[in-house]
């Protein structure tokens, strides 16, 4: 399923790093799970996925419970989808939109490309590996994080297009990270830009699509 902000192209770099850090952990927590490209590839005794996007979490829960998305979505279906139930609204809003931007315009492909079918197949395949994932629709600070967890945070980037209408307070988030780190939690943050006054160790990979990815591996001395 096409999804703005999805990490499908860099998952092969991120997952091994996360998996290595999970060796002595009981739980993997994805606080901003989005389309679940990362958590679906993670192996852990317990997995928690959270996102503030209500319809998106409704979609994941519906598929996990056996709902099968439609194989065909017409332009008229797309126009009516904002009044649909949350799970169908999310499927059409993300999976059938241009570049995966939530209701960013009906996607039209060349030839016989079927965006709905592609999104359906991708989502169902992904959920084959997520039968035991616990899904939540909460603010990141409200999630009950078990001790001995690895917490992965793919936060909204500054000055980029968001898939949610809510603004994101980066300063508050980093303060929360500092508090969680003090409690002994292992927190990794994926971000495009790192503040100059932040003392961190980063994992950096230059991708073929000419973008630097920074994986924060230590949240010490933040702010």
Give, region by region, the residue ranges found by the protein language model:
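Glycine-rich phosphate-binding loop signature in dinucleotide/nucleotide-binding domains
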Residues: 21-24, 144-148
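Short, conserved active-site loop motifs that form the nucleotide-linked donor/cofactor pocket
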Residues: 133, 149, 209
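Conserved proline-anchored active-site loop of SAM-dependent methyltransferases
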Residues: 14, 28-42, 49-54, 95-98, ...
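Mobile active-site "lid"/loop adjacent to the S-adenosyl-L-methionine
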Residues: 104-112, 159-171
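Class I S-adenosyl-L-methionine-dependent methyltransferase module
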Residues: 45-137, 141
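Long, positively charged, glycine-interspersed low-complexity recognition regions
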Residues: 166-223
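S-adenosyl-L-methionine
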Residues: 1-33, 37-38
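Short, polar loop motifs at secondary-structure junctions
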Residues: 32-37, 120-123, 191-196
């Amino acid at each position: 399923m096409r999804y703005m902000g999805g990490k499908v192209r860099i998952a092969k770099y991120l997952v091994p790093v996360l998996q290595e850090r999970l060796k002595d952990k009981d739980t993997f927590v994805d606080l901003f799970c989005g389309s679940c490209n990362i958590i679906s590839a993670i192996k852990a005794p317990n997995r928690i996925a959270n996102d503030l996007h209500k319809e998106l979490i409704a979609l994941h829960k519906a598929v996990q419970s056996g709902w099968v998305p439609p194989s065909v979505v017409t332009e008229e279906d797309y126009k009516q989808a904002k009044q649909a139930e949350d799970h169908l609204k999310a499927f059409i809003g993300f999976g059938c939109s241009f570049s995966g931007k939530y209701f960013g315009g009906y996607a039209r492909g060349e030839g016989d490309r079927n965006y709905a079918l592609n999104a359906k197949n991708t989502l169902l395949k992904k959920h084959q590996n997520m039968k035991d994932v616990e899904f939540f629709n909460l603010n990141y600070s409200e999630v009950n994080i078990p001790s001995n967890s690895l917490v992965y945070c793919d936060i909204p980037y500054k000055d980029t297009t968001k898939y949610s209408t809510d603004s994101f307070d980066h300063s508050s988030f980093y303060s929360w990270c500092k508090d969680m780190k003090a409690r002994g939690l292992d927190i990794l943050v994926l971000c495009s830009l790192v503040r100059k006054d932040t003392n961190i160790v980063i994992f950096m990979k230059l991708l073929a699509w000419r973008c630097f990815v920074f994986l924060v591996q230590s949240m010490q001395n933040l702010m």
